[in-house]
Regions:
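Active-site-adjacent loop/helix segments that line or gate small-molecule/cofactor pockets in enzymes
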Residues: 22-26
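General beta-strand structural signal in soluble alpha/beta enzymes
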Residues: 16-21
Length: 163
C-alpha cells in the first residue's frame, strides 16, 4: 500500500494530516455538534451509500473503525442497513428501522457507547426512523449535517499543526 499522507508531505514539503470522511465528521460532531461536551464513548455513524463510523473515546479518535462492515445476520451491515439500501430496495421507514435496530443493537452490545450520533444525508429525515429504534444508548441526529466532514478535517489539521 501507499502511505498517502507521507507521499503528499514529501511532494508538498509541508505538514499533512489525513483521516477518512466518517472520522472527520465524528471529530466535528464531538468538538462542535451533537456530542459536544458529552463524556465517554461516542459513536458517530454516517448513513449514505454505505455506513461510515467514527469512535471517539473521551475526546480521542479511534481511527478507521469501519463499523459498516460488521457482519449482521450473515451480511455486511451496510449491504442491509445503509440509506442507499433503503432506497435501492424501496424499504419503508419502518422496515428500514428494523434493519437499523439490528445494526445499532449489535454495535451497542460491542461498545456500550454513551451516545450515538447519526449523520449522513438521511439524518435530515431523522424523525421518520430514529423514534422507531429501541436502544439503551441515547441516539441523536447530527447537527453539522453535510458540513461535518470539512469541519472535522479542518479541526484535525489545526490540532496537528498546534502539536
Amino acid at each position: 500500500g501507499v502511505n498517502l499522507t507521507e507521499l503528499m508531505r514529501e511532494h508538498l514539503g509541508r505538514p499533512v494530516t489525513g483521516l477518512n470522511d466518517a472520522d472527520a465528521a465524528g471529530l466535528a460532531e464531538v468538538a462542535f455538534g451533537a456530542a459536544k461536551d458529552v463524556p465517554g464513548t461516542i459513536i458517530v455513524t454516517t448513513l449514505g451509500t454505505g455506513i461510515g463510523s467514527a469512535v471517539i473515546v473521551d475526546g480521542t479518535l479511534v481511527p478507521n473503525t469501519e463499523l459498516g462492515h460488521l457482519e449482521i445476520d450473515g451480511y455486511d451491515a451496510e449491504s442491509r442497513a445503509s440509506a442507499g439500501q433503503r432506497t435501492a430496495q424501496d424499504l419503508s421507514w419502518k422496515k428500514w428501522a428494523k434493519r437499523l435496530q439490528r445494526y445499532y443493537s449489535h454495535v451497542e452490545m460491542l461498545f456500550s457507547p454513551d451516545l450515538f450520533v447519526v449523520g449522513g444525508g438521511v439524518s435530515r429525515k431523522h424523525e421518520k426512523y430514529l423514534p422507531l429504534l429501541d436502544l439503551k444508548t441515547p441516539i441523536v441526529p447530527a447537527q453539522l449535517l453535510n458540513t461535518a466532514g470539512i469541519v472535522g478535517a479542518a479541526y484535525q489539521a489545526s490540532r496537528a499543526r498546534a502539536s
